[in-house]
Amino acid sequence: MAAAPTQIEAELYYLIARFLQSGPCNKSAQVLVQELEEHQLIPRRLDWEGKEHRRSFEDLVAANAHIPPDYLLKICERIGPLLDKEIPQSVPGVQTLLGVGRQSLLRDAKDCKSTLWNGSAFAALHRGRPPELPVNYVKPPNVVNITSARQLTGCSRFSHVFPSSAYQHIKMHKRILGHLSSVYCVAFDRSGRRIFTGSDDCLVKIWATDDGRLLATLRGHSAEISDMAVNYENTLIAAGSCDKVVRVWCLRTCAPVAVLQGHSASITSIQFCPSTKGTTRYLTSTGADGTICFWQWHVKTMKFRDRPVKFTERSRPGVQISCSSFSSGGMFITTGSTDHVIRIYYLGSEIPEKIAELESHTDKVVAVQFCNNGDSLRFVSGSRDGTARIWQYQQQEWKSIVLDMATKMSGNNLTSAEDKVTKLKVTMVAWDRYDTTVITAVNNFLLKVWNSVTGQLLHTLSGHDDEVFVLEAHPFDQRIILSAGHDGNIFIWDLDRGTKIRNYFNMIEGQGHGAVFDCKFSPDGNHFACTDSHGHLLLFGFGCSKYYEKIPDQMFFHTDYRPLIRDANNYVLDEQTQQAPHLMPPPFLVDVDGNPHPTKFQRLVPGRENCKDEQLIPQLGYVANGDGEVVEQVIGQQTNDQEESILDGIIRELQREQDLRLINEGDVPHFPINRSYSVNGALSSPNMDIPSSPNIGLRRSGQIEGVRQMHNNAPRSQMATERDLMAWSRRVVVNELNSGVSRVQEECRNAKGDLEVSLYTVEKKKKPSYPIQRNDYQPSCGRSLRRTQRKRQHTYLTRSNIEHNSQASSQTSGVQEDSDSSSEEDETVGTSDASVEDPVVEWQSESSSSDSSSEYSDWIADAGINLQPPKRQTRQATQKIYSSSEDENLKLEDRQKKPKQTKKKKGGLVSMAGEPNEEWLAPQWILDTIPRRSPFVPQMGDELIYFRQGHEAYVRAVRKSKIYSVNLQKQPWNKMDLREQEFVKIVGIKYEIGPPTLCCLKLAFLDPISGKMTGESFSIKYHDMPDVIDFLVLHQFYNEAKERNWQIGDRFRSIIDDAWWFGTVESQQPFQPEYPDSSFQCYSVHWDNNEREKMSPWDMEPIPDGTAFPDEVGAGIPVSQEELTALLYKPQEGEWGAHSRDEECERVIQGINNLLSLDFASPFAVPVDLSAYPLYCTVVAYPTDLNTIKQRLENRFYRRISALMWEVRYIEHNARTFNEPDSPIVKAAKIVTDVLLRFIGDQSCSDILDTYNKIKAEDPDSSDLEEDSEMVDLDSDGPGTSSGRRAKCRGRRQSLKCNPDAWKKQCEELLSLIYEREDSEPFRQPADPQSYPVQQQQEGESSQSVPPDRQDPSLSEDYQDGIDTPMDFSTVKETLESGNYDSPLEFYKDVRQIFSNSKAYTSNKKSRIYSMTLRLSALFENHIKNIISDYKSAIQSQKRRRPRYRKRLRSSSSSLSSSRAPSPKGKQKQMKLQPKNDQNTSVAYARTSSPFSSPVSDAAEGVSLYLLDDEGDGPFSPSSFSGYSRSGNSHDPGKAKSFRNRVLPAKQDHSLDGPLTNVDGREPRTGAKRKLLSASEEDESMGGEEKEMKETKEQVHLSSSESGELGSSLSSESTSGSDSDSESTSRTDQDYVDGDHDYSKFIQTRPKRKLRKQHTNGKRNWKTRGTGGRGRWGRWGRWSRGGRGRGGRGRGGRGRGGGGGRGRGRGRGGRGASRGSSRAKRARVADDEFDTMFSGRFSRLPRIKTRNQGRRTVLYNDDSDNDNFVSTEDPLNLGTSRSGRVRKMTEKARVSHLMGWNY
């Protein structure tokens, strides 16, 4: 007999038996139990006497009832994670009981030691290959062992020879500033010897990889470069731009090869096809117009066909194709679009054809990428729906593996940004080199590595601090991938191990970090190049950097930004030399300021390598810039006496004489006259070898842009001779590939293409796994039906419309059409071209700089193509379309045989008059405030009967009318087994923007007996259609209809169009035989007008006795109000709480009336004025407002209280949809919603103001904690500051920290530094509306190019919509010099206001003005951080020293403090109004206290629900602290435009005893806080020194908290972090509305009145900040055009122009006494809220966004296709921001320039 088992063994046997019993092995369990009992292996039991007894297995189970059958399994599952904490396994997340070594569950520390091989181990071969290193081989193998082994075996593994750790030796060779704007495109040529960069300054530059030299500049584009591609033969480069043009250059000579014009909007991606079939090649381009063009070209002649094969994929207005990717063999190309559809085209036929449309994604497709190898037809797609999909063609269909970004590594508890981002989105996708893994970048800053075959998550890579939009796989090493993002970080990752190898942070000295926009590996993998937001090219590689040390840090050619002239075909010539840019002489190398580099650098220019020294000295001259100033510039090359023309010499001599005369007269010009004159009279520079330092020189004047404005007149000697042209045409910039290399690569691509065709053919013949649904899209052979039309010229000037109007009109007069011809018209997808049949016109001068912005925004999301500014024509006539087929006659015959295809023409978003097109408006059935039986308007909580027959009829009607695209596979009857009628309840409602506006419902099944939800649900979309019967019927109406039990012959009446119609029941039979039990339209009726129809019983009403019949038989009679009311829904018990519906409705109506008395609720009082803001309806699908809710309450519209609460929530939802989530208007909407919801929920509450006060009091210190936590950031040194520099400045900083007034000098120095920067130029002076008309702002035209008679003075009207608080550096400087700032915080706020205004008024995040704002903001915040920190330290130091003088102060006879006045925010906590001795006398941010103000004009302003589209600029956004002022002189049309307020040089003193008064002498209404009376009494009883101590304490507290807040704000970008409580957004204290206020204190929460006098012509003018304040913009002002996206990295563009606008809003200064006590009550409430809300005004600011990320969808959002699109708890949870707040922001809000409140 075996030995007795131990206790653990016996228990293990028991657990095994229990585990077997719970599984499929029951027989084995029985046998085991028998053996356990037989061998007495079951533990014995003990009785009370201690005797042992045998027991059965059943007894043991009963005794251990707490042990579940799977107890053993659970033990095994828990062992692994517990062991991992002590001894981590080698592969995290793998759970196995059978592991070995470090994967074993029995492992100990000894097993985990790293393995080391000797040299002989490497010399062994395993199956003819070197062995794989074990997982625990930590260190790279010894290179000696590897080399020796390779000598012995003749082979080695690449991972052994070149371990991944070798990439740690990559370093940055050089960072070169070569562009004036952000650089979004970089590419290597096929040899890797050349680098190409494409920038927003419209230039493409060619660089040498080996030494970083600038070799050539390709000019011609008139807008931002959106994408570039180099052909596989290395002979051509193509660049797409926002100017809608694709330009192709020859790489060898830089000569233009083709200008391809086939798009009507910006180019989004461009690709050369890898296919090598014959001599015909393809270049593809996709655009924001929803088209893809296939351009044919000949590989030998490099000639392009003018007419592309074109597919228009615009399923609805505004659809863009955002990304594209070719397969490795070139037989397939896939595209991703904003309509959520992936389209695949096949190039294996004679012409490209579309073969598939994949609609699995539910949001925009932002990235697609084919695999690198042709052995499988696979590609990966990434979408903003939070998933990526790996697609593969199998059995006649494209099947996909879903990669859910919410998936986490098992055993990995990452909680960083991953859990903070609720709405996950894919930003970029990539394959590794061998396609074994797929890498996705997610908007939570993580990279995820997936197995490309199984879809399993392998690694999660963390390290980035912002979104990643660059993923670049190594060209041959599958382990390596590169990532870069807008946080400035560049990472090299090891995909095998999931670890970081190397990272680089792009820190720019004094300017913060530069966001990295693009990266590319060289073909040999030895280099990679990156580009950033500041215009830099970063070169990385192995080896030393000595060759790169020989080049300057800034490299521009002096001809880079010369103006160009264009012909009718868009080819360009240099305006000065009248030569093609590639035939011009070798240029000179200059820095960013336009200063020539020393002669040693000039030899770096191709063509100047062998020049003599005198030929390397550029000729300098003085020319007039655009502002009329004379500046010094390079105008050409210095020549010998015999070569120069007479005219050149005369000009130079006259110039020299003029300069000397000016010097003798003492009138020194702006430029330095420090040059020596050569013998021949030419100017020479004796200091040529002294390099100029950055940010000085020409940019110091603040009037020109260095290389951007070179010269206006080139000397005749610079004209090229025939000999020169021949020599320059032979210059080789980029060599062609070696013939052998080229042949091998072509054979490889050819083989891949053949394999792809073979795979496609084989899979196409296989039997599908299920029947294939026929595609809904049209075949690609149809002809476009758009009318023949010419492109109209608009009446305002843009870069692409500079041709003289006289010539343009005379040449196009015969072919122009009305402006209602729209490029939005539907057209049959077909092969067509877009070549322009313009007559040949003469060369015309393009007077604007080549850097100005493109004509239209291509960054319009779903807003529509060619969207022009509001109140202007928004559509363009399209061009005539011709068939590009060679067999035109055959296709014509085919078309004649087919029926004519016609489609309903769709209009644009806005008509010519600025009115919104009717199809975009919310339909009446949604807007109606009167309850009706039909059409059915859903409300939350409705219990319904759903009729499948009616829903199917609706879908058929939609498809027949082609109203919108319906996916039959997503209909509920195809997803689940639905009966003919279902009892359901509405648990979610969402509206989608149209046309048409769709209602999306989530319907939960109800149990017919209990009435409770079963847990299942489905979703539907529908809208009200004429002649389509409602298929949703209220359960109450359905039950009533069933009880009537209609019989044949019964008379009935029915409501149709608010009239009673009479008829007779003829018969009853099912509407459809397959649904015999359905009541839907089961009655056949005979109307009295002899018509017959099918009716449903709930649409029929009995005829009461005494009913009046119509005079004519068959006519109708109107429905009375009483009859209509009787037919409405009757609330059930409990649906309105404890009260009746009437009682609740009246209570809420009174609450809304009281709520509207508060200023912060007034913006939500009435509907938006769509005539003023026509594009609002394209953003908000379900508009609502407080007045609409009140009307519906009065009409008893809501069926239950939950429906009312749902609509109240939509107020905040609409605000969040239209605005940034942290903008003040959203916070105001949240307050309105929270207060109203709390009031509705508390049925015992009768005063909504009490509810409002309670909500305020609940969270008064919520943001103080943030302030304290952010103080650490402020004290720490910023990145990039060297320790040596800190040590050097430590003594000075220490002294500054002890001087409370040292900040003034520091701020002056900082302001001077800002003035030296070129980026500050647009913000130095306020904008002049006469110089910067509104058209220029919106269309991007330089103001100098607009003649005065063409300028539009209406800028102020447009400007005021976006900027409530104009600000510029000159105003800040005057305020600082006059001593009107009490602390650096106020200085900081005003400067931040400048940046906030710029971002709020710039509709695009990637426009040039936006980039300038980012750079300047980063520079400012980098310096202001230390200033505020020093100030805080000084205040604290002063506080520590103060108690020593306390006794002496108390003994003083003076009751007033003579110390420095406390911070204006110091008394915020005290909440009391205290006048000060020194009253600031600057412009105030409030409404003007003008004598013209009146209650009538105040009411006429018409407060609108229109929401501010704030770009989110931190605490000082224009929406945060503006007073919404209007011009006080509003009766004078000539003075209606904005004007700049002057700042008095010193503060005015006002008596502390006298009250502050308004213009008419009345006392202004105070903004007293909660404890006004008691606090004032306390202050009066307090001694002067005690009061001073109290104020000082509060001041120090403020400084600490505010400084801490600023620590998190000091980043390169910002979002609005201000809470608000004024009339518009509750943003400013009531004081700012009623009284005059110092403009430099506009952020203070401590209420005070600033009385200000300004004497002009002997008159006294009372002004407030924002009152007539002129726009603070300068040269570029607002930029309105969007950019583009390529593969998910799309970005916004911009427009150009500037201007000012008067402040907006409401203020009642001077009229406070006329409104009585109710007004004072409102003021007190508003002030209280303001006080609590402003504690969180500083929020962390996001960094630069991306090229594609800025775009947001507004049209059909397929979220509803997911059954869980709406939460049952919160039906408005339609997506969340990074901060976790619900949002659905759209780019249309930016495009439409709907900035500001609609007053």
Curated annotation (Swiss-Prot):
Gene3D superfamilies: Bromodomain-like (1.20.920.10), YVTN repeat-like/Quinoprotein amine dehydrogenase (2.130.10.10). The keyword Phosphoprotein applies. WD repeats lie at residues 170-209, 213-251, 255-297, 307-347, 353-393, 400-452, 456-495, 502-542. One of its GO terms (biological process) is cytoskeleton organization. Residues 1584-1596, 1624-1640 have a biased composition (Basic and acidic residues). Transmembrane segments: none annotated. Residues 784-794, 897-907, 1438-1450, 1646-1663, 1681-1694 have a biased composition (Basic residues). Residues 817-828, 1260-1276 have a biased composition (Acidic residues). This is Bromodomain and WD repeat-containing protein 3. It comes from Mus musculus. The lineage of its organism: Eukaryota, Metazoa, Chordata, Craniata, Vertebrata.
